[in-house]
Amino acid sequence: MKIGVVTFPGSNCDMDMIHAMGHELQFDVVKLWHKSRDLDGADVVILPGGFSYGDYLRSGAIARFSPIMESIVAHAQNGGRVFGVCNGFQILCEAGLLPGALLHNESRKFICSNVQIKPVSRTACLTREIDDSKPITIPIAHGEGNYFIDNDGLKELQDQDQILFRYCDENGKVNPWSNPNGSLDSIAGVANKQMNVFGMMPHPERAASSDLGNTDGAQILTGLAALIEV
């Protein structure tokens, strides 16, 4: 099993992801450069958080045109797994690999805090093994995490079990007060119809080490590689 982590100009969570996947979870991890088209045999490609290309125009709008994205799109279209976290999620939406868009937070402020999320999809590899009877705690750090999609798109996400996580309170209840950024339907992450491309705003790589006092994110990252035969 080989995990590829992409570095764009402005990425600042790539090394965190490499540490979580390689040191903490013991996967074989390779670094992928935005100017390359070579995925170096990666079974799973991860687009980490940060501020790719300075978030000019809007988050992810320039990164989607990077040479590496041509290979990532082809990888996804061939059934390969792709995972975007925070800015990576924004890039995947801009590239059309995931439905919807990420808008400015409802508060118009950058938010950095721990939040509670609950798994929703019972189909996606990321979430199906996570206990849905209680929330998990994962950090967020974003200014444009307000997920939006039109009404038809939202219904399709719900009907096709494509919603990965919703923001919730510490008791697992979804309500307006537990939604940190105004995301429609309290959505914190989604998958594509084929269930091989995933995106979420919270940072599981920042909650994958007992040294940091939180390993809730490790089960998400482990699920990413589940059932892949190599």
Language-model-derived ranges and their functions:
Residues 1-85, 93-99, 103-111, 118, ...:
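N-terminal beta1-alpha1 cap of cysteine-dependent amidohydrolase-like domains
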Residues 1, 132-135, 192-197:
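Beta-strand-turn-beta hairpins that frame and shape the catalytic cleft
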